[in-house]
């Protein structure tokens, strides 16, 4: 790590000196929903350390839409163009130049720029190109340095990782729990779609971006049957690309459940989960969103992802781990590298689920325990 002498110990370790006279702060984090939820405590720490500064998120188009007129630690969003290792273009998104973006961003005259987007091989050059007085963040072995940096080590809880990163600039942790409050507009949109609840609601989210994180649809259907039998109204949520797996859960459940595919915007989904007695989900953005809005959760994790992403709290949450360490198809050991193998890495091209060993009974027992209070 390279940084000035620390001011003193914080709740998670040393806290560096604050940067003087900071009016504008850039924060690079341009990936998906769950990834963003993980940095909310870091953003709250930055807000507490620099209460008068404007915090600008360098993010994706969905960030700009979500944070428009929404209270929280983000004042403004600058949309970063698609770039290798940063983000892929949205469907139909017009081409844009990273060089033009950086030129426009430099006109903001940032005092402080924070890299909270992975190890920095692709993101540190962008942060360095903003022209801020001070840059800080994470650095993997193949990444260029920033003014203040902390070594990026893959297996670390994401919330703690980014809290340690912002501590480099004097932003001590104020919480380790991501929190997000649905707005009145969010709640009204959710009510318009879902109507009033006649029974307590639970939500199941059977999708996940990576197929290796998906618990089988028939297992979710078994959970739906159990909870519907206990008297709960069961919602099955999904994005439009998850229509097939939602349909599989609904068809296999054998009891009335309510599919919600693409009917709820992100804010309305947050409000929906906030009003649920429980959310059961694969390791996914919606799982982390549910936890952030205060819903009790049962999360199904591959063990490597559990290290990085599962909440450490158990009062309202039950992460359940799959201990699979070898590809279920070819048997390749997936522990030497990072999660578990990227597509095409090494000798294993397979995308089969790594969480099929999680039993239905364990998920149902965890759900019932949380629902019992």
Q: Language model features by range: what are they?
A:
Residues 1-373:
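Catalytic machinery of carbohydrate-active enzymes
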């Amino acid at each position: 790590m390279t940084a000035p002498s620390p001011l003193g110990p914080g709740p998670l370790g040393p806290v560096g000196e604050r940067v003087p006279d900071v009016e504008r702060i850039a924060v690079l984090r341009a990936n998906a929903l769950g990834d963003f939820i993980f940095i909310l405590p870091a953003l709250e720490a930055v807000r507490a350390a620099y209460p008068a500064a404007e915090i600008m998120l360098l993010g994706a188009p969905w960030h700009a839409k979500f944070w428009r007129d929404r209270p929280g630690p983000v004042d403004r969003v600058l949309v970063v163009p698609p770039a290798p290792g940063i983000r892929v273009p949205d469907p139909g998104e017009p081409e844009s130049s990273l060089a033009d973006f950086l030129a426009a961003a430099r006109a903001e005259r940032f005092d402080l720029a924070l890299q909270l987007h992975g190890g920095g091989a692709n993101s540190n050059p962008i942060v360095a190109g903003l022209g801020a007085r001070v840059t800080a963040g994470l650095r993997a072995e193949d990444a260029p340095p920033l003014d203040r940096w902390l070594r990026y080590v893959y297996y670390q809880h994401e919330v703690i990782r980014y809290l340690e990163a912002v501590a480099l600039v004097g932003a001590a942790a104020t919480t380790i729990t991501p929190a997000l409050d649905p707005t009145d507009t969010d709640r009204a949109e959710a009510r318009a779609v879902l109507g009033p609840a006649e029974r307590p609601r639970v939500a199941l989210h059977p999708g996940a971006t990576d197929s290796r994180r998906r618990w089988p649809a028939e297992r979710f259907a078994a959970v739906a049957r159990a909870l519907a039998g206990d008297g709960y109204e069961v919602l099955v949520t999904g994005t439009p690309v998850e229509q097939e797996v939602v349909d599989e859960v609904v068809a296999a459940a054998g009891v009335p459940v309510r599919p919600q595919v693409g009917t709820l915007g992100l804010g309305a989904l947050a409000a929906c989960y906030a009003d649920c007695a429980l959310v059961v989900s694969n390791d996914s953005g919606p799982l982390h969103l549910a936890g952030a809005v205060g819903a009790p959760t049962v999360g199904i994790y591959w063990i490597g992802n559990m290290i990085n992403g599962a909440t450490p709290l158990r009062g309202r949450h039950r992460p359940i781990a799959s201990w699979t360490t070898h590809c279920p198809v070819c048997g390749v050991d997936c522990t030497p590298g990072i999660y578990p193998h990227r597509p095409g890495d090494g000798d294993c091209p397979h995308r089969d689920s790594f969480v099929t060993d999680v039993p239905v009974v364990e998920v149902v027992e965890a759900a019932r325990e949380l629902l019992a209070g």
